[in-house]
């Protein structure tokens, strides 16, 4: 039985998540999609906006599914599986829409820490929507708005028809998250091929989306930022493990996501790793072949000790 692919929609209040969700549900993509959404307050509004195109909508109220009501999220996920197994509903993809003030971190961890959920669901990717009109002000005022960008596998820039292309904002987003490509979306209309099957939580060699350019952005502007570490020499596997363990011991609470491709001394294959906060995995990938071996790592987090991290990896050079 193949696991059910899960897409998480995040983004600050008014960024356009429900508009995008409505577009997803009305597209002729051939998927049977279940939806979990959550709202502040007693009554859901978005389920009235979405319509009845989803197989089943679970509306979670009275708190964020991503933080204070994580048990309720687990119950909703298990309830969907129970109804699926009983034949009451059919779906082959799940979309979770987080409320605008929610931290995606705990919901991501749910899919790795719950025995049944990690077997039956596969977290495919995190899609962050960013309002081009208000994003700078929101990110200046609310660290959570930066955090949502930091967790993303894809960043969708909305309202550029009003704000323009917002090149400085793109630079800022790249500084926060060096591994997520940025796409423009107007009124939720976007090729779903860019949103589905992103393999955001699979071990892969594409660690950094592009070489970010940061000359527009001052360090003090973002609480959350990316650190890209590149090494042109092999590293000992036990030594790099020690560095990673120390990093997690000292900064796990500050780390959002991290990925890497490592050149391990004496090994013909590249080693890939990826993690979310304290949870991470690693595995051997294909041989280097004719490619020049190298290591590339990206760490995304809150006020990370950049100099210490770079120094720790630089110390691995023999």
Q: What is the meaning of each model-derived region?
A:
Residues 86, 118, 144-147, 219:
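Structural motif
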């Amino acid at each position: 039985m193949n696991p059910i692919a899960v897409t998480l929609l995040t983004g600050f209040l008014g960024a356009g998540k429900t508009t995008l969700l409505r577009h997803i549900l009305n597209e002729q993509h051939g998927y049977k999609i279940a939806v979990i959404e959550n709202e502040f307050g007693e009554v859901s509004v978005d389920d009235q906006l979405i319509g009845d195109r989803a197989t089943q909508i679970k509306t979670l109220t009275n708190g964020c599914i991503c933080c204070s009501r994580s048990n309720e999220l687990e119950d909703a996920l298990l309830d969907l599986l129970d109804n699926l197994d009983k034949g009451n509903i059919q779906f082959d993809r799940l979309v979770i829409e987080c409320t605008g003030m929610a931290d995606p971190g705990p919901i991501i961890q749910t899919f790795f820490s719950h025995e049944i959920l990690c077997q039956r669901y596969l977290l495919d990717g995190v899609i962050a929507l960013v309002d081009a009109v208000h994003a700078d002000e929101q990110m200046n005022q609310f660290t959570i708005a930066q955090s949502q960008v930091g967790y993303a596998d894809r960043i969708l820039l909305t309202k550029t028809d009003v704000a323009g292309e917002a090149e400085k904002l793109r630079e800022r987003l790249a500084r926060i998250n060096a591994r997520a490509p940025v796409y423009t979306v107007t009124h939720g209309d976007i090729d779903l091929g860019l949103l589905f099957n992103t393999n955001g939580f699979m071990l892969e060699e594409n660690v950094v989306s592009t070489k970010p350019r940061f000359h527009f952005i001052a360090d003090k502007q973002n609480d959350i930022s990316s650190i890209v570490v590149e090494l042109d020499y092999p590293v000992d596997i036990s030594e790099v493990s020690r560095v990673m363990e120390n990093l997690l011991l000292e900064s796990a609470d500050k780390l959002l996501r991290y990925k890497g491709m490592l050149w391990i001394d004496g090994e013909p294959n590249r080693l890939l790793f990826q993690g979310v906060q304290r949870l991470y995995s690693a595995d051997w990938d294909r041989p280097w072949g004719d490619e020049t071996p190298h290591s590339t790592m990206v760490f995304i987090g809150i006020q990370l000790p950049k100099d210490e991290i770079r120094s720790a990896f630089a110390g691995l050079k023999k």
